[in-house]
């Protein structure tokens, strides 16, 4: 004899309005079917509770809770509940919109690695759905890749739907019925549980943000932040262990430093150290992506370009590969050498001359000579010879001018800059004093940047001002801007830049450079710049006490 828990529903009509077409999944609580709503000829999903559970008051209440929680939500990225009712045989069902896609777990299994831009698009939509849910007083409590559906839409190849509010918590006083949780009661999926959830403590919306941090970690690395063979093992690690940085788990993955910092902040044990809300989390995530796109669109020097003059000679000898920039931009997954980072700092090793307008005019003249091709006939060959000679003389003159300007002339030695670089300034001008958590006599590179003072978007804007100053050879202003940006973000790539600025000034400040490079290495232990830094400082890079 067949029981109601078999797939006997397929081909039948439930509640006189849903014709069941196929079984598409099942779990401990029931089965999930694809069905067609007859009155609208619309495909829907039916979740049917098992008959054997109808006598369990808590399970029935949980099933009703899912319908109630999801029905409160009205957001494009949240699954919509269409109906709740009882079948002819007494089984309870929920009718929901049908999503023709795959869940995020399937995407991870089939398509990893995912590029950072795609991850940002997907997770931003998840955070939008959570922001709406949290505003409606609903905490998901079981967010994981299997509960995130992704389907292609006309204007979005990865359109997200967050589903399965089966253990959602409704936080207002209008909720009635039997309590689904009690002190010390733990529900959820252990791999994605926040520490407070694993402890059985009272939860708020920041518990969901921790789960988003776990998902982000997994999307960027293909791995969970913690590994265990048991639910208890996962819960213990969420409670007691710090997650290893994503780039340490996957040194080959393309993970920007800003993305790594955001992931680790979302995984903070203390909810107060995580992003304050889903909306704030989304804003920080999109700021990370904005900077990534800016770096991706930055002009790169072509190794094959022969139609323009080569840049002025460097002050120090360049490596044989110095004219070829790594296709990977600085700061991505620690894949770039220090030399590539130096090349990303225009003006430090190749500063403009004092009379930049004259140099631009000279380059325009020489460019026109380079682009002039020899014509037919003997006289054109002679003309081409003299034009080539002219180019060589111009380049030599420019080189001599640059050497004279930057190294000084005669026996006077190196000329000092007409301004002083800021050194060990505790807080740069324009920065917020609350941005650093130490006494004023502690150098900026040894300070902890407290979470309450972080402003990633402002830091990116200030760092761009520093880049522009560096392009104008205004090294002093560049250093000031980089320091201010660092005080707002703690970005280890800014520490690397500041080390370069102080090391390559005319009168190098090696102690200041050492301080900034130590900070970079402390934040990025696997940095590919380590070998070159230690070589420059003769192996004297000491690891300072963590701030």
Swiss-Prot record:
Coiled-coil zones? none
From the UniProt entry, list the residue stretches annotated as the region Disordered: 290-327
**Residue stretches making up the Protein kinase domain:** 18-288
**Residues that coordinate or bind ATP:** 24-32, 47
Q: Name one Pfam family in it.
A: Pkinase
Q: Which SUPFAM superfamilies match?
A: Protein kinase-like (PK-like)
Would the keyword Nucleotide-binding turn up in this protein's UniProt record? yes
Q: Where is the composition biased (Basic and acidic residues)?
A: 290-299
Q: Which reaction does it catalyse?
A: L-seryl-[protein] + ATP = O-phospho-L-seryl-[protein] + ADP + H(+); L-threonyl-[protein] + ATP = O-phospho-L-threonyl-[protein] + ADP + H(+)
CDD domains given in the database record: STKc_PknB_like
Please list the residues that make up the active site. 142 (proton acceptor)
Which keywords, in A-to-Z order, does the entry hold? ATP-binding, Kinase, Nucleotide-binding, Serine/threonine-protein kinase, Transferase
EC id: 2.7.11.1
Q: What PROSITE patterns does the annotation carry? A: PROTEIN_KINASE_ATP, PROTEIN_KINASE_DOM, PROTEIN_KINASE_ST
Look up keyword Ligase and say if it applies.
Answer: no
The protein's GO terms of the molecular function aspect are: ATP binding; protein serine kinase activity; protein serine/threonine kinase activity
Q: Which family does it belong to?
A: Belongs to the protein kinase superfamily. Ser/Thr protein kinase family.
Annotated protein name in UniProt: Serine/threonine-protein kinase pkn3
Q: Which organism is it from?
A: Myxococcus xanthus
Gene name in the database record: pkn3
